[in-house]
Design a protein with these regions (language model features):
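Short, hydrophobic-biased segments on the C-terminal half of alpha helices
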Residues: 48-52
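A short acidic, leucine-rich amphipathic alpha-helix
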Residues: 35-38
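Amphipathic alpha-helical dimerization/coiled-coil segments
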Residues: 79-107
Length: 107
């Protein structure tokens, strides 16, 4: 699974997970839904089916509208989103510790 994030490796390679992975990684920026689909490697029609539930659960938030295009990002004020971000950070630290231990073992 080289080139796949730890978040996806842990939770599975599913469209919703790919979208969340992209939104977590890019949480400081906002994107139109078409770019989210493209960057998350999810079919736009699939994302259109997932999106209402993500909005309803408060995982994503509208940041602004530019010329009729609505921009979104992960809702970092949402407790569930906060825990997902925390999980992603934890997975990265665990992986870094594992690599550090492997490098310390003479071999």
């Amino acid at each position: 699974m080289e080139g796949t994030s730890l978040f996806i490796q842990t939770l599975g390679d599913y469209p919703a997970i790919r979208v969340l992975d992209f939104l977590i990684y890019s949480r400081d920026f906002d994107y139109p839904i078409t770019e989210i689909a493209h960057n998350a490697r999810v079919n736009f029609q699939t994302l259109k089916k997932l999106w209402p539930q993500m909005e309803q659960n408060g995982l994503v938030v509208v940041t602004r509208t530019l010329g009729g295009i609505t921009l979104y990002r992960i809702n970092t004020a949402n407790p569930v989103a906060q825990k997902l971000i925390e999980l992603n950070t934890f997975l990265c630290w665990q992986y870094a510790e594992k690599i550090e231990i492997e490098q310390e073992v003479p071999g």
